[in-house]
């Protein structure tokens, strides 16, 4: 299958930033977005949708992109996710990622079907991380950044397996959540976390009634 290329980018003005995020589905941790401006004459080979790359390939490309491209990273915290909902938190992280570039790109391509509410010239591209090289590069920066954050927090909250599952709702994470309860990094607005919190409150409510 063909890798992402510049075909869908060539009709837009430069400098062009590709934007993508990582971490909408997890039960814990922030959502992280990245904005990347590639030098079309000098960029790492092998750029692809981060989901299609091995851990080793992502890490290697992350290092090369940080050296050879202009990269900005933005995040929305767990508190912001719970206050805004994941959709708007994702948009907020993208806005922050572009702002983190330090200057205004001439055009922005965003992965997905909708751009943030901003005045920037931009376009949303469905499956952009599989089609546009700049968005694919952003997917790598966002994914590796978020994975590192969750791996670092794994030592603070042992037992949840974040060094492996990165906060996603894997069977081991779901089991740990039920057995150990939520941490401050769990998203209270997400269904399973809400369910566990409600279950843990029931015995307390019963004893209070007695």
Which residue stretches match the model-derived regions?
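RNase H-like, Mg2+-dependent phosphodiesterase core
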Residues: 1-210
